[in-house]
């Protein structure tokens, strides 16, 4: 963003950009209304109720944009001077509502201003998170914390309805191109408050949007597939999770190393469940060495090492929200261990004692025969092992061919 000398210059620059009415000018105005831009730190812009003062340095020719800018200055004052994120969040919602009512709903033959709207929504999420932190520190605890995210979601959803009902089809006019960005905004909010079920109609709308999908920005497509993949992982849909996360990783710019790393945090467990283990070089390249020991232990079928690896790097995995997901890798670890036992025995009838001895060898001493049978029965039910239990003879009878199918073939069935 170019240097802003004073408040008059600030209004002038926004006013001049409004005349252009292009997507590029919308991008530039969005920066002038961003809470993370350099201008936000300038003390001369930290003004409360600027719109009500009589000493206005400059009024934009666009009255609605002018009002939005004045409210933005009020937000800057609340954030930097009053240190009141709750009030800031409330004002930001007013901005979103005003933008919806006066711009999205009334300016029917244009959409150049959508980058401004995207920025306003992103800042609303940031303020909602800050307000939630402030509220959780009050005496009332977390009782009202989610209300900030919910009020943000409500405001964005109202805008979503406005955009999807737009009758225009032309790329330079239709507001439907905002669908994917708003879906991503709501994805992030619902992840925060654990209400991913509310995303079902939004996902269905994207699935059925037809040629419109090609008009969405690649950045939004990458983000959407990342969020969709994360949700699918937690839903247990490994095929959809892999599809979404692989798309996100491949289309994320090479220079965006931090974003690729975020994608891999979820793609690695998905690939492991499908039997594809990441290389040590990949983990090291993206600073994900926390996975190294987990990967090695699962491959070796060493349950004790899996538990130790999860314990050692538990804080990292919990922060990423994948600790419980990684715990489910124990099933694959059992499968890999039992496959090794079957290869050592070299027969289709394997005594259960052999499996129990192997478990003790890898540090699992608390599994009795009944629990062992239950573990094997689950592996058979999940089609990770082809065979049956001969309970009376205390043996596992495995198929003569492909007794341990590839995990990817099992997950695709």
Swiss-Prot record:
GO biological process: poly(A)+ mRNA export from nucleus; post-transcriptional tethering of RNA polymerase II gene DNA at nuclear periphery; transcription elongation by RNA polymerase II
Domain spans labelled PCI: 222-403
Entry-linked InterPro entries: Csn12-like, PCI_dom, WH-like_DNA-bd_sf
Gene3D superfamilies: Winged helix-like DNA-binding domain superfamily/Winged helix DNA-binding domain
Lineage: superkingdom: Eukaryota
GO cellular component, one term: transcription export complex 2
A Pfam family hit: PCI
SMART domains in UniProt: PAM (SM00753)
PROSITE patterns in the cross-refs: PCI
GO MF, one example: double-stranded DNA binding
Family designation: Belongs to the CSN12 family.
Protein name (record): PCI domain-containing protein 2 homolog
Species of provenance: Caenorhabditis briggsae
Lineage, uppermost ranks: Eukaryota, Metazoa, Ecdysozoa, Nematoda, Chromadorea
């Amino acid at each position: 963003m170019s240097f802003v000398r004073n408040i008059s210059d600030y209004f002038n620059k926004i006013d001049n950009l409004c005349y252009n009415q292009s997507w590029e000018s919308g991008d530039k105005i969005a920066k002038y209304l961003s809470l993370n831009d350099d201008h936000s730190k300038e003390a001369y812009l930290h003004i409360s109720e600027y719109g009500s003062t009589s000493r206005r340095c400059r009024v934009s020719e666009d009255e609605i944009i002018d009002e939005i800018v004045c409210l933005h200055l009020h937000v800057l004052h609340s954030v930097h001077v009053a240190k009141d994120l709750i009030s800031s969040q409330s004002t930001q919602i007013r901005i979103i509502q005003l933008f919806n009512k006066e711009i999205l709903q009334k300016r029917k033959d244009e959409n150049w201003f959508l980058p401004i709207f995207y920025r306003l929504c992103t800042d609303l999420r940031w303020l909602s998170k800050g307000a939630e932190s402030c509220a959780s520190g009050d005496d009332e605890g977390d009782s009202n914390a989610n209300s900030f995210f919910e009020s943000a979601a409500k405001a964005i959803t109202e805008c979503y309805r406005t955009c999807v009902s737009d009758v225009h089809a032309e790329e330079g006019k239709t507001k439907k191109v905002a669908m994917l960005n708003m879906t991503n905004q709501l994805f992030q909010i619902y992840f925060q408050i654990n209400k991913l079920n509310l995303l079902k109609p939004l996902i269905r709308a994207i699935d059925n949007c037809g040629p419109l999908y090609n008009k969405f920005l690649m950045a939004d497509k990458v983000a959407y597939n990342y969020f969709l993949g994360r949700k699918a992982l937690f839903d247990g849909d490994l095929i959809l999770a892999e599809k979404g996360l692989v798309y996100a990783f491949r289309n994320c710019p090479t220079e965006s190393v931090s974003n690729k790393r975020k994608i891999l945090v979820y793609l690695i467990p998905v690939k492991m469940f499908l039997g594809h283990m990441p290389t040590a070089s990949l983990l090291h390249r993206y600073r994900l060495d926390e996975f190294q020991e987990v990967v090695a232990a699962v491959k070796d079928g060493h349950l004790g090492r899996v538990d130790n690896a999860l314990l050692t790097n538990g804080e990292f995995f919990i922060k990423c929200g994948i600790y419980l997901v990684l715990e489910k890798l124990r099933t694959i670890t059992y499968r890999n261990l039992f496959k090794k036992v079957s290869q050592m025995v070299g027969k289709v009838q394997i005594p259960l004692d052999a499996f129990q001895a192997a478990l003790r060898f890898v540090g699992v001493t608390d599994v009795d025969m009944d629990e062992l049978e239950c573990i094997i029965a689950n592996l058979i039910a999940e089609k990770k092992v082809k065979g049956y239990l001969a309970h009376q003879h205390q043996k596992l009878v495995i198929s003569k061919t492909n007794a341990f199918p590839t995990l990817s073939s099992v997950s695709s069935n």
